[in-house]
Amino acid sequence: MISALLGRSKSELEEWAVAQGQPAFRGRQLHDWLYAKGVRDLQGITVLPKAWRASLQNEGVSVGRLHEQERRVSADATTKLLLGTEDGETLETVGIPTDQRLTVCVSSQVGCPMACRFCATGKGGLQRSLAGHEIVAQVLSIREVMERRPSHVVFMGMGEPLLNIEAVLESIRCLNDDLGIGQRRITVSTVGVPHTLPRLADLALKQLGRAQFTLAVSLHAPNQALREELIPTAKTYPYDALLDDCRYYLNKTGRRVSFEYILLGGVNDHPHHASELADRVGGFQSHVNLIAYNPIEEEEFQRPTTQRIEGFRRVLERRGVAVSLRASRGLDQDAACGQLRRNRRS
């Protein structure tokens, strides 16, 4: 017996409807109401027989949507939602609009066990991993609130996606097949967990038939010593081993790897850091995405100066490294990962 309908494919819903003693077309109706119409509860699916809806509700079956608890909208229209789960946990998701696209930043866990020193989410530890349908529900919540169809999804919210690979891949299948978001418009970001990058490549090819989503690996330092200072779990994952696993992923999937590098003022933003980073990733089929630090309260790190940011980028460009600078969004509304939830709990 399933408890949440969201996250199921059309064929799964058809088979389930038949197993419930209903005709297969009831499954197709469910699929339409779940994904196209975005229904929030069973009673809202008025095309289904009333008696069946009541029976399902009595059996504990639900749509599987999340409940909005707080909303913040910044001056640039970036929208952050604090969402509640059925078991009383809270998580964050962010809608980032431009003229041409709407990107949804989703969480893969409630909290995070990685404890990166510069990250608000890591301050509270891990509560649990999210189910696949809870990830999909975040995208539907942003679509509902912003009244726009999401075009891109990035797994850059709360949690470490590679500690929840099965649910992440389940959600990617659903986002692609049921919500029509192409895999090439989906990015999975990881700080790096030993042995999981090869597993991600292998499972994606096995379960999805292809691995066309973008893999973004968070480096945040040009050497092992500094990386261990910023990311405690890096002590168990040497830099060279991480890059070897990235090469495996590249060779297995044929997809270029993106390297994320958060610039922390006076910590890892010096030109010699940029030169050292170029030594690491030069010749690697990759792209470096620079991110200026988004300050959180009661934290020792600071946002680097514009001069430092541009200087870092110029060093990489001169070394032939493909590089871009991510625009900061929602700075006035606690839009960095974990800030809203942390402030709500404090």
From Swiss-Prot:
Gene3D superfamilies: 1.10.150.530, Aldolase class I. One of its GO terms (cellular component) is cytoplasm. S-adenosyl-L-methionine binds at residues 159-160, 189, 218-220, 294. Disulfide bonds join 105-337. One of its GO terms (biological process) is tRNA methylation. The active site is at 92 (proton acceptor), 337 (s-methylcysteine intermediate). GO terms for molecular function: 4 iron, 4 sulfur cluster binding; metal ion binding; rRNA (adenine(2503)-C2-)-methyltransferase activity; rRNA binding; tRNA (adenine(37)-C2)-methyltransferase activity; tRNA binding. Its cofactor is [4Fe-4S] cluster. It catalyses: adenosine(2503) in 23S rRNA + 2 reduced [2Fe-2S]-[ferredoxin] + 2 S-adenosyl-L-methionine = 2-methyladenosine(2503) in 23S rRNA + 5'-deoxyadenosine + L-methionine + 2 oxidized [2Fe-2S]-[ferredoxin] + S-adenosyl-L-homocysteine; adenosine(37) in tRNA + 2 reduced [2Fe-2S]-[ferredoxin] + 2 S-adenosyl-L-methionine = 2-methyladenosine(37) in tRNA + 5'-deoxyadenosine + L-methionine + 2 oxidized [2Fe-2S]-[ferredoxin] + S-adenosyl-L-homocysteine. Residues 98-332 form the Radical SAM core domain. Coiled coil: none annotated. Its EC number is 2.1.1.192. [4Fe-4S] cluster binds at residues 112, 116, 119. Belongs to the radical SAM superfamily. RlmN family. Specifically methylates position 2 of adenine 2503 in 23S rRNA and position 2 of adenine 37 in tRNAs. Reaction proceeds by a ping-pong mechanism involving intermediate methylation of a conserved cysteine residue. This is Probable dual-specificity RNA methyltransferase RlmN. It comes from Synechococcus sp. (strain CC9311).
